[in-house]
């Protein structure tokens, strides 16, 4: 089977499912998986920025090229220029469709309250994919799944619960781990984790945030996210 560039008009049923208004003219590129280089899938799983160029003969896909940061210099000028913008974007040309996929930072906030809400609001403003999780069992799974592109922020006055969340973040690969709370809370968490044979806390920023004499929830959120941005940029 060959890939196709499809033109459809969204009907009422499709609008209900997709959220796209009824009557919208939409274009979809459908390409069989075997048209892609096998290395494409590991790159997408690892959330590596890539550019996909589907070459067209009218509406039929004739070839698919995939570029990453190491090979984008060999792409055509339009693809390289779109990739250089550093954001997910798409362009449709008569002879090809260019799809640039840039991963979005995931931010998991384990805790609740005004500070968590302020961090979530500012994180969303940054364009990050934000999850505020209050249930410990859900937080542990999310924290452990983070990548070096992502950030984890731990808060809470209950030592065992917040320590479990901190331990889960350390098990994952989050590029930034921030722990809110006093120095005493930081030590209490460190002691709890030590009983679990977790002693390397070098990746943890605690108390989290840069020193701007923050006091309000929004100021604290700015302080913490500024530190997170700086650390993620290093990665």
Protein language model annotation of sequence segments:
Residues 200-230:
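Active-site capping/gating segments
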Residues 145-160:
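Rossmann-like NAD(P)-binding element
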Residues 138-140, 183-188, 211:
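Short gly/pro/ser/thr-enriched loop/turn and capping motifs at secondary-structure boundaries
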Residues 168-192:
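ADP-ribose/adenylate-binding Rossmann-like module
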Residues 113-114, 159-160, 184:
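Residue-level detector of alpha-helix initiation sites
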Residues 1-136, 143-147, 227-235:
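Segments forming oxygen-rich coordination pockets for charged ligands
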Residues 160-161, 167:
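Cytosolic regulatory regions of ion transport systems
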